[in-house]
From Swiss-Prot:
Gene3D superfamilies associated with the record: Vaccinia Virus protein VP39, YhiQ-like domain
Catalytic reactions on record: guanosine(1516) in 16S rRNA + S-adenosyl-L-methionine = N(2)-methylguanosine(1516) in 16S rRNA + S-adenosyl-L-homocysteine + H(+)
Lineage: Bacteria, Pseudomonadati, Pseudomonadota, Gammaproteobacteria, Enterobacterales
Superkingdom: Bacteria
Official protein name in the record: Ribosomal RNA small subunit methyltransferase J
GO CC terms in record: cytoplasm
One Pfam family in the UniProt entry: SAM_MT
InterPro entries in UniProt: 16SrRNA_methylTrfase_J, SAM-dependent_MTases_sf
Binding site for S-adenosyl-L-methionine: R101, D102, E117, R118, S153, S154, D171
Main location: cytoplasm
């Protein structure tokens, strides 16, 4: 995959070329999307819209830390949707990991989550965020146990993941109407990089075959059900709904 690669660390230790080799990235000086290694983290920038700033994965501080400490925990919609109850903490495959927010919420309340991400740039961002999270004194211990990254396409990986999870979680890219600055910033940068998930409808059936209990699909409230397969079961929030489908018992 071609992208502009920029090293702002000033160390000259070749870390960026090692990273490029690992994720199969090729430097393209003219690419509008840039993957930038800063002294603090790896980030994605849209070079023709510098005001958007960089997008990076941070499990330790910022919004994720606030959500972990002060969010709803088990009461969050995604936790309810995957079926967390009492001692039951399902094993989850998040087949559309993105920046890992929902996966992190589930891991923080006790679920073991395997994140799938097919885009190598997004996978590199996730891997960088995980490395910093694993090294953190406060959350590193449980994060290593509960949150892992698999760089693979969900369309193929969903057929051969072992052991089978109890829940498969899907949150395919869908054009957002919301006007919040954060959504606009991230969606604009993200959609410039990966585009819409045009093959997302093909995920539902393999997900249902893989999950032993249920499949949860996050949709904006105005979006049709995935693959146009309606379900009466959903957890509904202000702007989204989490459609719930039966899996395939072991």
């Amino acid at each position: 995959m071609q992208i502009c690669l920029i090293d702002e660390t000033g160390t000259g230790d070749g870390a960026l070329s090692v990273l490029a080799t690992r994720w199969g990235l090729e430097h393209d000086e003219d690419n509008l999307m840039a993957l930038v290694l800063t002294p603090e983290h790896l980030e994605l920038r849209k070079r023709d819209e510098p005001k958007l700033g960089g997008i990076f994965v941070d499990f330790v501080g910022g919004a994720m830390a606030h959500r972990r400490k002060f969010g709803g925990g088990r009461g969050e919609a995604v936790a309810k949707a995957v079926g967390i109850k009492g001692d039951y903490l399902p094993d989850v495959v998040d087949a559309t990991a993105g920046l890992g927010r929902d996966a992190f919420v589930l891991a923080s309340v006790g679920c073991r989550v395997r994140m799938l991400e097919r885009n190598p740039v997004v996978a590199a961002l996730l891997d960088d965020g995980l490395a910093r999270g694993y090294a953190d004194a406060e959350i590193g211990g449980w994060l290593q146990e509960r949150l892992q990254l698999i760089h693979a396409s969900s369309l193929t990986a969903l057929t051969d993941i072992t052991p089978r999870p109890q829940v498969v979680y899907l949150d395919p890219m869908f054009p957002h109407k919301q006007k919040s600055a954060l959504v606009k910033k991230e969606m604009r940068v993200f959609q410039s990089l990966v585009g819409p998930d045009l093959d997302a409808d093909g995920l539902l059936e393999p997900a249902r075959l893989l999950a032993s209990k249920r499949v949860v699909v996050k949709r904006p409230d105005y979006a049709p059900p995935l693959a146009n397969v309606a379900t009466p079961n959903a957890v509904v929030t202000k702007g989204h709904r989490f459609d719930i489908y039966a899996g395939t018992p072991v």
